[in-house]
């Protein structure tokens, strides 16, 4: 693919099956969220037969790939990551067009893949070390086996970063991969695979594009698929779990969140703190699983907090992400925008206070695209959809509390358990309270995966997911324990 900012032509991508790039008679069109009449490109509308061939190719390639040591596989993977440092500006322009990110967000995601995954490769030496212990009349050893064929299904909001959080650990562990990119934002991810595929043996990584309704069941029920790694919505995960249960496949899920942020009376309301909080809420137009989705603030500081927070939010510049002055792009789809507007309207009907903020320099462009201004909703009912559901949009509800234990209880009263945060100048007290949040990843005075040490895992509990990404735990998601015991006379 060639993507030039000043000479734009639609990109027509292909599928990768058994080392061969292939197409199909039908195509899926990809349009720009900022300019919905602009065709960004197309991908093949793959069929179940394409999935069958990709799985067969992955299965055939897996034994030889698995026969290498972790260190040998790491040596093969390392040059892939170096390749992914190239063409960032060109690839970012494509990413912005198909996704709606800002240029800064697109560059950060693309550049973050090699830097993060180099840390994954550093774990190879640790993985090569078996654990052993005395056993009755002999010795016992603990080693690890790959699952085999892993299906990787990723969403549109961060497809490149999230895909490689699955692909690299899976490959390092000795698995082969069948990747299903998101149908509304597949091009940047396929471009990345084009860059690395020549360095891998045929069949080690395969790419099948298509509509979930047409190829999803084959991907998740096929008897030769040993594990499914999925990032996406809870309803889709339930269907995947049901499909995977037919053959008891391994499964890793990274799902939605409704993360609370609890401010204490002594919370820092200065510019830097408010910018960190606003970034967590409005990054990627609020279309992030681990982000602040609800704010709980003491009644005593509600006014001061709202003044400080809205002053920061009002500086956000909304528009086409190809403009480097823009700090928040459009919603990804018209359907997502309609839902966001509906749940905000519902809150308003319940007498909530809705503040529409931000700067819109290009008002004509704003009207054409799937744009929405950053919004703060206060005085909201606890059972309003904006509070209860994952809104996945640039709007955040604010509720007040008098007793911090009540705030913790309300924060935990959800099916979600991805992230949560406590904001206070008293780090010790905030840390103690953060540990009371029923979430897999918790924070003090910050909120988001970018704040987590990249050598450590993150993930959700409850209905926000199963398993972990990153760190040694993230690699072992793609490994199975094998215990070997010898009897020695």
Where is each model-derived feature located?
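Residue-level signal for inorganic ion chemistry
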Residues: 37, 73, 95, 174, ...
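Conserved C-terminal structural/oligomerization subdomain of aldehyde/semialdehyde dehydrogenase
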Residues: 38-41, 225, 317, 367-489
């Amino acid at each position: 693919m060639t993507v030039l900012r000043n000479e734009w032509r639609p990109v027509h991508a292909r599928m990768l099956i058994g080392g061969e790039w292939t197409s199909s008679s039908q195509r899926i069109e990809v349009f720009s969220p900022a300019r919905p009449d602009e065709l960004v490109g197309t991908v093949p509308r793959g069929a179940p037969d394409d999935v069958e061939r990709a799985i067969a190719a992955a299965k055939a390639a897996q034994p030889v790939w698995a026969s290498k040591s972790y260190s040998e596989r790491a040596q093969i993977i390392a040059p892939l990551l170096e390749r992914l440092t190239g063409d960032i500006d060109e690839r970012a322009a494509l990413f912005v067009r198909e996704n709606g990110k800002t240029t800064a967000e697109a560059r950060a995601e693309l550049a973050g893949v090699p830097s993060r995954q180099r840390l994954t490769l550093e774990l190879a030496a640790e993985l090569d070390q078996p654990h052993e212990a005395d056993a009755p009349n002999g010795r016992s050893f603990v080693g690890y086996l790959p699952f085999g064929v892993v299906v990787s299904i990723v969403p549109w909001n961060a497809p490149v970063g999230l895909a490689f959080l699955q692909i690299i650990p899976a490959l390092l562990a000795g698995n082969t991969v069948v990747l299903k990119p998101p149908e509304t934002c597949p091009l940047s991810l396929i471009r990345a695979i084009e860059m690395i595929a020549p360095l891998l043996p045929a069949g080690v990584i395969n790419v099948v594009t298509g509509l979930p309704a047409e190829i999803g069941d084959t991907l998740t029920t096929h008897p030769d698929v040993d594990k499914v790694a999925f990032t996406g919505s809870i309803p889709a995960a339930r269907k995947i779990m049901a499909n995977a249960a037919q053959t008891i496949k391994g499964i890793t899920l990274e799902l939605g969140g409704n993360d609370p942020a609890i401010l204490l009376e002594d919370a820092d309301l200065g510019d830097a703190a408010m910018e960190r909080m606003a970034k967590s809420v409005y990054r990627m137009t609020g279309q992030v699983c681990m982000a602040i989705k609800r704010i709980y603030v003491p009644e005593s500081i509600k006014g001061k907090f709202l003044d400080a927070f809205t002053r920061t939010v009002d500086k956000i510049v909304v528009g086409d992400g190809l403009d480097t002055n823009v700090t928040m792009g459009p919603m990804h789809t018209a359907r997502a925008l309609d839902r966001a507007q509906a749940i905000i309207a519902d809150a308003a009907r319940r007498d909530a206070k809705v503040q529409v903020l931000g700067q819109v320099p290009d008002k004509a462009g704003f009207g054409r695209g799937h744009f929405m201004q950053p919004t703060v909703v206060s005085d909201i009912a606890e059972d309003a959809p904006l509070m209860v559901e994952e809104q996945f949009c640039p709007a955040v509800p604010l509720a007040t509390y008098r007793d911090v234990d009540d705030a913790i209880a309300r924060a935990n009263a959800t099916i979600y358990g991805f992230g949560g945060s406590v904001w206070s100048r008293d780090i010790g007290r905030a840390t103690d309270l953060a540990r009371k949040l029923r979430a897999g990843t918790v924070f003090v005075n910050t909120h988001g995966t970018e704040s987590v040490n990249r050598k450590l895992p993150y993930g959700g509990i409850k209905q926000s997911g199963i398993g972990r990404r990153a760190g040694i735990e993230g690699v072992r998601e793609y490994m199975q324990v094998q215990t070997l015991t010898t009897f020695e006379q």
